[in-house]
Regions:
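Flexible, glycine-rich terminal cap/loop adjacent to redox cofactors
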Residues: 113, 130-210
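A short alpha-helix-loop-beta-strand transition element characteristic
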Residues: 65-68, 115-125, 149-154
Length: 210
């Protein structure tokens, strides 16, 4: 969809520098082949996530293991210091999303109260609020291959869905990844209208091991 709009995608292309140019700005990158390439544009949007707001906490003095200020926790949201828990954007290696922090908070609170609970990352969806919307939960094909999982894929084009056509949103698809033998849902990926709402069904299927 975005390629049709004239957008160009360059993945695995780390930025080396951003410089002023007659057009506006020039971004210098290194591509997968190790070659230096550059792109010019009027504006550059930098979207690299948030920096953990932990500088004032003196993590080292508290003995908390961290990676550049992001606190390392286990699946119970507990740090290496017994009784100390961390959740949200200050946690290392987790998605910086509000619903992710909420799920972490529930797990931490239950463990603090003595109720065993673990954070299940695979049932926590990721949503991209754009046009068209995109959403994902569970494993991708690449992750299944890396884990050696025998899987199968089902795809449904939204152009075949009446409700999508009614709202002029026929462009998009739903992709489901399932275990090849037992047909348990391993992942769901959607692009199209209301994808960020529909992904909840995929998260439910994963949580119920359907």
């Amino acid at each position: 969809h975005m390629k049709k709009m004239g957008m160009e995608f360059n993945l695995e292309c780390p930025v080396q520098a951003v410089e002023a140019s007659p057009v506006g700005a020039k971004v210098v990158c290194k591509n997968k082949a190790g070659e230096t390439v550059s792109f010019e544009a009027e504006k550059v949007l930098v979207a690299i996530g948030r920096k953990a707001n932990t500088a004032s906490l003196n993590l080292e003095a508290a003995g908390l293991n961290n990676d550049r200020g992001r606190i390392i926790v286990n699946d119970k949201m507990e740090t290496n210091v017994p009784g100390v828990y961390a959740i949200g954007d200050c946690v290392f290696g987790k998605a910086q999303l509000a619903h992710t922090a909420s799920a972490m908070g529930e797990v931490a609170a239950e463990n603090i109260m003595g109720i065993p609970a673990v954070y299940d990352e695979k049932t926590n969806p990721t949503c991209v609020y754009m046009e068209p919307e995109a959403a994902s939960v569970g494993l991708t094909e690449e992750q299944c291959k890396a884990k050696g999982i025998d899987y199968k894929v089902g795809k449904f084009p939204l152009v075949a869905n009446g409700k999508s056509l009614i709202i002029n949103g026929g462009e998009g698809l739903v992709k489901i990844i399932a275990d090849a033998k037992y047909e348990e849902v391993l992942g769901m990926h959607i692009i199209g209208p209301r994808a960020t709402d529909l992904i909840a069904e995929g998260a439910l299927a994963l949580r119920l091991e359907a």
